[in-house]
Amino acid sequence: MSTQTVALDIMGGDIGPSETVPAAVQALSLLPQLKLILVGDQHQTTPLLQQHGLLNHPRVRFVHASQVVGMGDKPIVALRTLKDSSMRVVLNLVKAGEADACVSAGNTGALMAMAKCVLKSLPGVDRPALIKALPTLSGKRTVMLDLGANVSCDADTLLQFAVMGAVVAEKVEGIAAPRVALLNVGEEEIKGNDLVRHSAELLRQCQALNFVGFVEGDRIFSGECDVIVCDGFVGNVALKTAEGVVRMMAQLAGYPRKKRSFLGRIAGFMFKRRFSYLNPDQYNGASLLGLRGIVVKSHGRAERRALCNAILLAAQEAKHQLPLQIADRLESVFSDRDL
């Protein structure tokens, strides 16, 4: 059985070691082939590591980092001045081949800037993209990109995103011939701006893609397509809107019992059970695609269960050697296109 080594930034995020360390314990218990390199401040975390039995764990190694990237730090400042931060060190471990993947719940902008600087882009990749799996009514998952790495794109970049997203759907989600769609304001070919219509032509001409046309925002979670492609501005707005709706629904289901009728309490209980699959913890972890290494961004406010899922995602991508798969597919698609 092959092993996957994941470097975990235990200092990152709004909560930090009090959640990342227990998440590491959970991930190790769920995945026997997983090895972890925990990166953080040794003096601050040693008592916590000892408490959770990780100091002498056979599948755990600790690497000290003297700095931490704050959630409010500007990316350019973090890139230039925080070279011994836990975030930077996990990326260095991936670059050096000591880790197969890395996970951080830290500052998103800083992570993207550092990842591009340390790991570099794959050959032919203009811009890396953030991708995330989302739940659908079909019970399967849809992957969506870009979710905020690039606020503006051209048609060629969206084509690259589509190819990379299709590889993720195939290798990580196990979907044969994934259906690829562009997010648009309508399903008709005449709908959308010039960028979306031009991108649709490129995707339609790409024989390596199973392009099914446009999908509207209200169908993102329908399960009608397996890969949804958009620029980072649109994708981030769509994702944050969906997260807000889920939070609102959860709060309504948890409305104070004393203020609800008997039937209201029953309805709230049934709602929680029926829609438990919508729990964002199950889908935590957005991957930065198009780099020469695997980088998974956990939500900054993620707790241990969610962080554990981000670690498992990183290990799964490492198992499938995702960057190599993407590089091979891009070379095949774009070499044929240039002929």
Swiss-Prot record:
Cellular compartments annotated: Cytoplasm
Gene Ontology CC: one annotated term: cytoplasm
UniProt pathway: Lipid metabolism; phospholipid metabolism
Biological function: Catalyzes the reversible formation of acyl-phosphate (acyl-PO(4)) from acyl-[acyl-carrier-protein] (acyl-ACP). This enzyme utilizes acyl-ACP as fatty acyl donor, but not acyl-CoA.
Pfam family name, one: FA_synthesis
Gene this chain is encoded by: plsX
Subunit record text: Homodimer. Probably interacts with PlsY.
Protein family (similarity comment): Belongs to the PlsX family.
Catalytic activity: a fatty acyl-[ACP] + phosphate = an acyl phosphate + holo-[ACP]
Classification via InterPro entries: FA_synthesis (IPR003664), Phospholipid_synth_PlsX-like (IPR012281)
EC number: 2.3.1.274
Name under which the protein is recorded: Phosphate acyltransferase
GO terms under biological process: fatty acid biosynthetic process; phospholipid biosynthetic process
